[in-house]
Amino acid sequence: MIQAWHFPALQGAVNELQGSQSRIDALLEQCQESLTKLQSSWHGSGNESYSSVQRRFNQNTEGINHALGDLVQAINHSAETMQQTEAGVMSMFTG
């Protein structure tokens, strides 16, 4: 069985995921700005309900972004480890 690793593709995946993470952050910031303006016009229980939902949304989104960051680190670490292993194996055969 032959295993071949395409390290540039793995790095490309890491870069794509990091880009997604940045886009999520930017969209969240835009969303927050718009919603802050809207929230200022609400009073009473509507404002409280909105605040509760917004906090939950923020927590969930932060969780997703954190998981995405963990995935980026795991893929990056795996690619580095595989590359080091492959270099070590190649050096055994090339002297």
From Swiss-Prot:
Localization in the cell: Secreted
Assigned GO CC terms: extracellular region
Alphabetical UniProt keywords: Secreted, Virulence
Domain of life of the native organism: Bacteria
Main location: secreted
Classification via Pfam families: WXG100 (PF06013)
Subunit relationships: Forms a tight 1:1 complex with EsxB.
Similarity field: Belongs to the WXG100 family. ESAT-6 subfamily.
Protein's recorded name: 6 kDa early secretory antigenic target homolog
Organism, as annotated: Mycobacterium leprae (strain TN)
Gene it is expressed from: esxA
